[in-house]
């Protein structure tokens, strides 16, 4: 089960917002988006694109794969990944089996990632392939030695190291299979979100429920909801709540999500010219480099130009 300790998590948020929660769960929001989107393109990651129907199939396969690995409702699935189709698909898969996602920032040092994992003791960890090089603290054998509860170590890329499996291997093995039924309630644990750690050596970890985080995401963007029915570029990390909120907002409107794996002005402008986004989600520091880039090229689409 999710390890909840008073010094780590806020478990009783104030009830003085004046707005009731919407009773949402991520599996239901995703199912509604799939129904609306059908065979339209839902997710773009570089040259890799998924329609809503294909994304549903991939989510189901990885959900079943997690279950067959031993992940059960309430377990934690840690994602230490850049923006990618693997990240969002595994987040959806984990939610559909009642598991709790913990995003871990790419900028964290391996020792800091390891410290977070040892605190939370996840049932599954998903990492980039480069973390398995050189016998570091995030290799499959090293993690399994200190995390006896660990049932799966997944890596991106084409080659699995010792004690790991690639995301693609799990996807292919369980393709066409549905996950075993699990009750996911609006008040079920959904996300463990660590703070940046800039105020102490021990990051705080906040526990969010499905309805709490999703209601907030819908409320935050409801004034501009129609724009999210178009094409959205997420140019900030999905390991931050701001990045995740952009993904949820697109799901509410069955919008097309385009991912930028890391900030680079040239790659962003190229992507914006190609995709013609109606919404770009980025942090202010990125936008300070975006404006000069647009001025130099004079070729960014109007929809992607800052005012």
From Swiss-Prot:
GO molecular function, one term: CoA-ligase activity
InterPro entries named in the record: AMP-dep_synth/lig_dom, ANL_N_sf
Source species, domain of life: Bacteria
Pathway: Antibiotic biosynthesis; candicidin biosynthesis
BP term (GO), one: antibiotic biosynthetic process
Keywords: Antibiotic biosynthesis, Ligase
UniProt function note: May be a p-aminobenzoic acid-CoA ligase that activates PabA to start the biosynthesis of candicidin.
Family affiliation: Belongs to the ATP-dependent AMP-binding enzyme family.
Protein name: Protein Y
């Amino acid at each position: 089960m999710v390890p909840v300790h008073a010094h780590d998590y806020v478990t009783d948020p104030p009830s003085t917002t004046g707005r009731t929660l919407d009773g949402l769960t991520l599996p239901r929001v995703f199912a509604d988006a799939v129904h609306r989107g059908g065979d339209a393109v839902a997710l773009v990651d570089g040259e890799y694109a998924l329609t809503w129907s294909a994304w549903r199939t991939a989510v189901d396969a990885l959900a079943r794969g997690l279950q067959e690995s031993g992940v059960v409702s309430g377990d934690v699935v840690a994602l230490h990944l850049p923006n990618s189709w693997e990240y969002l698909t595994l987040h959806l898969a984990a939610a559909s089996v009642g598991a709790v996602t913990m995003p871990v920032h790419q900028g964290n040092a391996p020792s800091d990632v390891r410290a977070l994992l040892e605190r939370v003791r996840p049932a599954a960890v998903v990492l980039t392939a480069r973390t398995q090089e050189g016998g570091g603290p995030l290799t499959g054998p090293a993690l399994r030695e200190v995390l006896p509860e660990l049932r799966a170590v997944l890596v991106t890329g084409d080659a699995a190291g010792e004690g790991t499996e690639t995301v693609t291997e799990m996807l292919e093995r369980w393709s066409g299979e549905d996950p075993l039924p699990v009750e996911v309630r609006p008040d079920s644990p959904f996300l463990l979100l660590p703070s940046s750690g800039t105020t102490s050596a021990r990051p705080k970890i906040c526990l969010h429920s499905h309805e709490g985080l999703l209601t907030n995401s819908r409320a935050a963007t409801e004034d501009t909801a129609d724009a999210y029915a178009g094409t959205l570029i997420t140019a900030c990390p999905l390991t931050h709540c701001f990045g995740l909120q952009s993904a949820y907002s697109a799901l509410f409107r069955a919008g097309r999500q385009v991912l930028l794996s890391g900030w680079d002005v040239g790659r962003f402008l190229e992507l914006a010219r190609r995709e013609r986004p109606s919404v770009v989600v980025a942090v202010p520091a990125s936008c300070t480099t975006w404006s000069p880039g647009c001025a130099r090229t004079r070729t960014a689409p109007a929809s992607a130009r800052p005012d």
